[in-house]
């Protein structure tokens, strides 16, 4: 594929809405975008004289992307709204290199009341409940279960879905037994109304619980009083720390973005009855080669939070600033929920103040991350080793084996300021030498870049040889990943450890570095390397134990350790040995040994 092919492809673009995709020489997807007019939009990325090249009017990052592009594909749609939905779906599924992906697939819980029931009660859901008389509260980004427990602790409402006679909750004064008509429906609904008011005003719930705790303590029921005290502490921790009430008892949502030092901060306020009942913030590292696209982020953020399978509580969304596809998003959401949804940018008044507050909190969240010690170290690493990316997302690799037995590899992940153990990976390896083992691990990880986006930095436990190996793999993948390697300093061909700390060398594509053992950058990289080493050793030991157990079974059959090792070397694992053809086993270790294996 060449630029000449690309120029021919540009001539086929229609004057209709749709989605376009850019690909590089290796066929890797670089970018997905949507357009009202595909021909006009896509051609705006290019200049055509004296030959095809990136339009210099675009940002440097966009120009870099276009220089990599050798092929484009497009899909036409009936409308720009359809194109936007398809674009968002492609970004989530395909993880293009130059698109920003907000990695948050969580669905948050709502507390709801079903008024179709004779005696309604509080329940929790993460999806839309298909009933007509439902009152929702939320979403709650943390502590929904704790809030529900606290409500039932103070307000004696029905808790069980079905009950024909007074249950245990009635016996402990936590229910008034409406199932047995021991409370009128009118009185029950009054209590429910008080509970719903307290749910929207946690300070009321806290005061009520404090009164209950005092009564329990006065009655020397200290165990129950302690439980109530713990509930109070939990609810205080859940309270949104932003004290701002809107004069009108309105329901609406607020979104704001902030971007600084390669960090994107998103913030969402949920306002019900004029009060901020929950807030959700998220920090996402943005790689240096990805275009900061405010419009793209607002689209993802709002579409993800207003999906069809969750309750719609607010018809109005306020955003901190204007973005390109705001009106188009209004159209999509209105069609999705079959009612008018407005997305507004308030200019003055209390709505403007709450949007400003959301933006200020988004900025504060970045500042909190920056005050973290490791963030400072990451900035120093970028400057000192001349890295292209700020290393917010780091993958660290190590291998472990014992004389060619139980060969394993390990990858650990450090994201922003903590270990992301959900991304740790283990590898069973075929090869027996360090170089081929590392090549196997890194290649397998690179092949997954389309499913799990690449990090900012790879840290390899090894020297320059393994650094060069990693570089080849990254270049062939087309990803933008910085690489460092860490190895023990060698004296007389032996690893040297000085008193007070390990003497390690850092290898980068710029050269080799010997840092002081007290250098914070070295200590940070050693911390990363040591965690990968710990994880690899632990996996190796567990694998070795399993192999030893299986080996002992063969030894009990009378096979020598030499024969067992010969079988493992040939078949790779015990499962393959047991499944092997009798004839093949006979040729390898003799008829007698083969019979023992197949008979057992």
Curated annotation (Swiss-Prot):
Gene Ontology CC annotations of this record: cytoplasm; excinuclease repair complex
Domain UVR: from-to ranges: 203-238
Domain GIY-YIG: 15-100
Entry's Gene Ontology molecular function annotations: DNA binding; excinuclease ABC activity
InterPro entries: GIY-YIG_endonuc, GIY-YIG_endonuc_sf, GIY-YIG_UvrC_Cho, RuvA_2-like, UVR_dom, UVR_dom_sf, UvrABC_protein_C, UvrC
Keyword Methyltransferase: no
Alphabetized UniProt keyword annotations: Cytoplasm, DNA damage, DNA excision, DNA repair, Excision nuclease, SOS response
Major place of residence: cytoplasm
Subunit structure: Interacts with UvrB in an incision complex.
Family to which the UniProt record says this protein belongs: Belongs to the UvrC family.
HAMAP family per UniProt: UvrC
Protein name (record): UvrABC system protein C
Taxonomic source organism: Campylobacter jejuni subsp. jejuni serotype O:23/36 (strain 81-176)
Gene name, Swiss-Prot/TrEMBL: uvrC
């Amino acid at each position: 594929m060449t630029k000449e092919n690309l120029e021919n492809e540009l001539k086929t673009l229609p004057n209709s809405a749709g989605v376009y995709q850019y690909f590089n020489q290796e066929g890797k997807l670089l970018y997905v975008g949507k357009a009202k007019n595909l021909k006009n939009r896509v051609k705006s990325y290019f200049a055509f004289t004296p030959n095809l090249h990136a339009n210099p009017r675009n940002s440097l990052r966009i120009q870099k992307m276009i220089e990599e592009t050798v092929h484009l594909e497009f899909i036409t749609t009936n409308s720009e709204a359809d194109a936007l939905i398809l674009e968002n779906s492609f970004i989530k599924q395909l993880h293009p290199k130059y698109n920003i992906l907000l990695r948050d697939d969580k669905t948050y819980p709502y507390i709801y009341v079903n008024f179709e029931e004779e005696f309604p009660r509080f329940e929790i859901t993460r999806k839309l409940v298909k009933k007509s008389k439902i009152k929702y509260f939320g979403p709650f980004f943390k502590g929904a279960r704790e809030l529900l427990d606290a409500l039932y602790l103070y307000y004696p409402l029905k808790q069980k879905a079905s009950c024909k006679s007074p249950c245990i909750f009635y016996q402990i004064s936590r229910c008034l037994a409406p199932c047995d008509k021991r409370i009128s429906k009118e009185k029950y609904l009054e209590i429910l109304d008080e509970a719903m008011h307290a749910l929207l005003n946690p300070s009321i719930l806290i005061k009520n619980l404090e009164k209950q705790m005092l009564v329990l303590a006065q009655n020397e029921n200290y165990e129950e009083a302690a439980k109530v005290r713990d509930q109070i502490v939990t609810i205080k921790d859940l309270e949104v720390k932003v004290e701002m009430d809107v004069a009108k008892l309105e329901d609406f949502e607020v979104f704001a973005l902030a971007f600084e030092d390669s960090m994107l901060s998103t913030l969402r306020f949920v306002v019900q009855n004029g009060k901020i009942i929950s807030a959700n913030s998220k920090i996402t590292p943005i790689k240096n080669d990805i275009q900061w696209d405010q419009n793209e982020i607002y689209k993802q953020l709002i579409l993800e939070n207003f999906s069809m399978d969750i309750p719609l509580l607010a018809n109005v969304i306020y955003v901190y600033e204007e973005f390109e596809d705001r009106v188009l998003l209004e159209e999509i959401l209105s069609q999705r929920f079959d009612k008018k949804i407005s997305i507004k940018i308030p200019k003055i008044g209390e709505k403007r103040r709450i949007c400003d507050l959301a933006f200020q909190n988004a900025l504060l969240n970045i500042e909190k991350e920056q005050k973290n010690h490791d963030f400072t170290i990451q900035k120093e690493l970028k400057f000192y080793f001349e890295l292209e990316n700020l290393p917010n997302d780091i993958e660290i690799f190590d291998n472990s084996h014992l004389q060619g037995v139980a060969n394993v590899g390990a990858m650990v992940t450090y994201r922003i300021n903590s270990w992301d153990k959900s991304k740790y990976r283990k590898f069973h390896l075929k090869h027996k030498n360090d170089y081929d083992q590392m090549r196997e691990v890194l290649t397998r990880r690179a092949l997954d870049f389309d499913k799990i986006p690449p990090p900012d930095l790879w840290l390899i436990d090894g020297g320059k040889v393994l650094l060069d190996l990693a570089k080849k793999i990254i270049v062939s993948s087309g990803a933008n990943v910085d690489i460092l390697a860490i190895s023990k300093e060698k004296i007389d061909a032996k690893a040297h450890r000085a008193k007070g700390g390990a003497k390690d060398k850092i290898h980068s594509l710029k050269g080799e570095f010997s840092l002081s053992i007290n250098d914070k950058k070295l200590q940070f990289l050693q911390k990363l390397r040591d965690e990968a080493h710990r994880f690899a050793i632990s996996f190796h030991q567990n694998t070795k134990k399993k192999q030893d157990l299986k080996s002992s079974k063969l030894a009990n059959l009378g096979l020598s350790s030499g024969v067992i090792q010969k079988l493992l070397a040939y078949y790779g694992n015990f499962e393959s040995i047991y499944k092997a053809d009798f004839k093949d086993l006979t040729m390898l270790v003799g008829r007698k040994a083969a019979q023992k294996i197949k008979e057992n």
